[in-house]
Amino acid sequence: MKNKYIEQFEAKQIEGKNVPDFRAGDTLKLAIRIKEGDKTRIQNFEGICIARRGNGVSETFIVRKIGANNVGVERIFPIYSESLESITVLRRGRVRRARLFYLRDRRGKAARIKELKK
């Protein structure tokens, strides 16, 4: 059981955030606030969510994209991070796993995920 003060603090952190419902296999577009010196700017990061773990304030997710020269780039984000401006779900993926770490070994068309039909 958590301390009531910790629970209040965590509830305050989660309070203002509007997080869409997404899971592993979904293609996400993230708007990340980056601070360089005294300036801040928004950088977009688009990729496939390959894992989601934890709960509450400490919940994180991993997004993987294939960058220049077919180099895979993975970033781990806390869901309730202040640096995340927005999370947009571009497409829903049809997968049968909660962790898609096998995509790390795949290249090209083999790394694609089928879209979920509604």
From Swiss-Prot:
Metal-binding is among the record's keywords: no
Superkingdom per UniProt: Bacteria
Any single GO CC term annotated in Swiss-Prot or TrEMBL for this entry: cytosolic large ribosomal subunit
Record keywords: Ribonucleoprotein, Ribosomal protein
InterPro entries in the record: Ribosomal_bL19 (IPR001857), Ribosomal_bL19_CS (IPR018257), Ribosomal_bL19_sf (IPR038657), Translation_prot_SH3-like_sf (IPR008991)
Entry GO MF terms: structural constituent of ribosome
Annotated disulfide bonds: none
Keyword Ribonucleoprotein found: yes
GO biological process: translation
Signal peptide segment: none
Name of a matching Pfam family: Ribosomal_L19
Stated family: Belongs to the bacterial ribosomal protein bL19 family.
Known role: This protein is located at the 30S-50S ribosomal subunit interface and may play a role in the structure and function of the aminoacyl-tRNA binding site.
Name listed for the protein in its UniProt record: Large ribosomal subunit protein bL19
Natural source organism: Campylobacter jejuni subsp. jejuni serotype O:2 (strain ATCC 700819 / NCTC 11168)
